[in-house]
From Swiss-Prot:
Record field: catalytic activity: a quinone + NADH + 5 H(+)(in) = a quinol + NAD(+) + 4 H(+)(out)
Entry EC no(s): 7.1.1.-
Record's protein name: NADH-quinone oxidoreductase subunit A
Organism (species): Paracidovorax citrulli (strain AAC00-1) (Acidovorax citrulli)
Reported function: NDH-1 shuttles electrons from NADH, via FMN and iron-sulfur (Fe-S) centers, to quinones in the respiratory chain. The immediate electron acceptor for the enzyme in this species is believed to be ubiquinone. Couples the redox reaction to proton translocation (for every two electrons transferred, four hydrogen ions are translocated across the cytoplasmic membrane), and thus conserves the redox energy in a proton gradient.
Location (main, coarse): membrane
Subunit structure: NDH-1 is composed of 14 different subunits. Subunits NuoA, H, J, K, L, M, N constitute the membrane sector of the complex.
InterPro entries: NAD(P)H_OxRDtase_bac/plastid, NADH_UbQ/plastoQ_OxRdtase_su3, NDAH_ubi_oxred_su3_sf
Record family assignment: Belongs to the complex I subunit 3 family.
Coiled coil stretches, renumbered: none
Length: 119
C-alpha cells in the first residue's frame, strides 16, 4: 500500500490542529496573567451582583432545547434526500415517508405528554 497518497490528508489534519492549538498556546504564554478579586467577580451591567450569579434553571428550558436540537437534526436529514430526489426513486420516497411518520408520531407523543406546554 502506498502511503504517499495519504500525505495531503495528514498535512490537512496537522494544519487544522495547529490552527486551533497555536493561538491558545500563544495566548496562554504571551498573555498577561494578573488575577485579582475584581476580575474574578461576576459582572452584571456595571453593578455588583445582587445575588448569587449561579442560579438553577427550570428543567423545561433544557427539555425545549433538547427537543429543538432533536427535531432540527432530524429535519437536516431531509436536505440530502431533497437534493437526490430524482436518483433515489420510489424506494427513497417510501423511506422518507416512513421517516416523517416516525417524526410525526414522536411530535404527537411529546405534545400529548405536555412537553411543549408552559404552565
Amino acid at each position: 500500500m502506498n502511503l504517499d497518497q495519504y500525505l495531503p490528508v495528514l498535512l490537512f489534519i496537522l494544519v487544522g490542529i495547529g490552527v486551533g492549538v497555536v493561538p491558545l498556546v500563544l495566548g496562554y504564554v504571551l498573555g498577561p496573567n494578573r488575577p485579582d478579586a475584581a476580575k474574578n467577580s461576576p459582572y452584571e451591567c456595571g453593578f455588583e451582583a445582587f445575588e448569587d450569579a449561579r442560579m438553577k434553571f427550570d428543567v423545561r428550558y433544557y427539555l425545549v432545547a433538547i427537543l429543538f436540537i432533536l427535531f432540527d437534526l432530524e429535519i437536516a436529514f431531509l436536505f440530502p434526500w431533497a437534493v437526490a430526489l430524482h436518483e433515489v426513486g420510489m424506494t427513497g420516497f417510501v423511506a422518507v415517508i416512513v421517516f416523517l411518520a416516525i417524526l410525526v408520531v414522536g411530535f404527537a407523543y411529546e405534545w400529548k405528554k405536555g412537553a411543549l406546554d408552559w404552565e
